[in-house]
């Protein structure tokens, strides 16, 4: 058995990314804005035109951004975004931004965030660095990213019906392109895909993804990986940053979330499709991993 790209695409398709663009505007002179970080959001900044500088709180060298560049913060690390290499001392009010104008002096910015469930962040982003600066012209997916960025920039200059909703949905696409870019550069950045690029783990993980409703144990997965139970568990936990059975439960609960979102499936049927013989055991696992009872997730 093998985990086909379509299976992974189906996993991503079921995700509700919920991207929101919270700032679009034209900035001039000695502007700067800071975020304390520490939230459960994943954030990004897009320079539509002009330039900007990113200052991390660890004292590292400021990073320069130019038109089309993306600053990506998988774990909402604290940072300051400014017009110049040196952060101005005077306060700056960006609560009432001027409309974006790509022909005006200064810089045009588009900032957004998305709030992935904690279990999804662990599967997808746990190994990502605090900060990624992406130059599309140097990216393996640069052509697609540039086309999307041009579309977002053009849309951000409009004052028409649906602009906010369109920018939010385009931000979903931008997030996926950022993930694609990152995995082209370093396949093991994503704990989920790290298992499928590891010769020792791939047979076991692929078999589970093919048949999540079957009875899975560490012993069974280790056998498929031709490893001892302890060696398999150690390697798996090191790569994925969670034990094998926690991964199994997390994957199953994401499948369950998709089925519950449809609103019509029987709870026991969902439980059995996710490898649980009783509805009570399924409800307990769902609440532990997702954070809410499955009944509240139905139809969301």
Where are the model-predicted features located?
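Generic protein-terminus/edge-of-domain signal
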Residues: 1-72, 77-100
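Short, Lys/Arg-enriched N-terminal segment that forms or immediately precedes the first helix
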Residues: 28, 186-190, 240
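Short helix-to-turn junction characteristic of helix-turn-helix DNA-binding domains
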Residues: 47, 208-211, 260
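Residue at a beta-strand N-cap/secondary-structure junction
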Residues: 62, 215, 264-265, 280
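Double-stranded beta-helix
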Residues: 85-109, 119-131
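An amphipathic alpha-helical interaction segment
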Residues: 110-119, 125, 130-206, 210
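Basic/polar phosphate-binding segments, predominantly the helix-turn-helix DNA-binding elements
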Residues: 173, 177-183, 203-254, 271-296, ...
């Amino acid at each position: 058995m093998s985990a086909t790209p379509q299976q992974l695409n189906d996993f991503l398709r079921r995700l509700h990314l919920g991207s929101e663009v919270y700032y679009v505007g034209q900035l001039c002179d000695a502007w700067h804005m800071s975020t304390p970080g520490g939230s459960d959001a994943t954030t990004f900044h897009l320079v539509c035109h002009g330039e900007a500088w990113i200052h991390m709180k660890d004292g590292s060298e400021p990073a320069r951004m130019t038109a089309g560049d993306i600053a990506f913060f998988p774990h909402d690390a604290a940072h300051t975004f400014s017009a110049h290499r040196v952060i101005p001392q005077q306060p700056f009010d960006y609560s009432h931004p001027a409309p974006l104008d790509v022909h005006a002096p200064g810089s045009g910015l588009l900032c957004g965030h998305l709030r992935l469930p904690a279990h999804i962040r662990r599967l997808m982003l746990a190994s990502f660095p605090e900060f990624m600066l992406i130059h599309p012209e140097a990216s393996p997916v640069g052509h697609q990213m540039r086309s999307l960025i041009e579309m977002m920039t053009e849309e951000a200059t409009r004052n028409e019906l649906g602009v906010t909703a369109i920018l939010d949905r385009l931000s979903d696409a931008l997030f996926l392109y950022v993930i694609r870019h990152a995995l082209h550069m370093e396949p093991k950045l994503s704990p989920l895909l790290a298992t499928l690029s590891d010769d020792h783990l791939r047979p076991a993980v692929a078999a589970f993804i093919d048949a999540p409703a079957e009875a899975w144990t560490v012993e069974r997965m280790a056998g498929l990986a031709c490893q001892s139970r302890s060696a398999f568990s150690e390697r798996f936990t090191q790569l994925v940053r969670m034990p094998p059975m926690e991964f199994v439960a997390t994957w199953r609960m994401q499948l369950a979330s998709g089925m519950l979102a449809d609103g019509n499936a029987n709870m026991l049927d969902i439980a059995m499709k996710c490898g649980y013989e009783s509805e009570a055991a399924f409800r307990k696992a769902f609440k532990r991993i997702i954070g809410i009872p499955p009944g509240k997730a139905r139809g969301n």
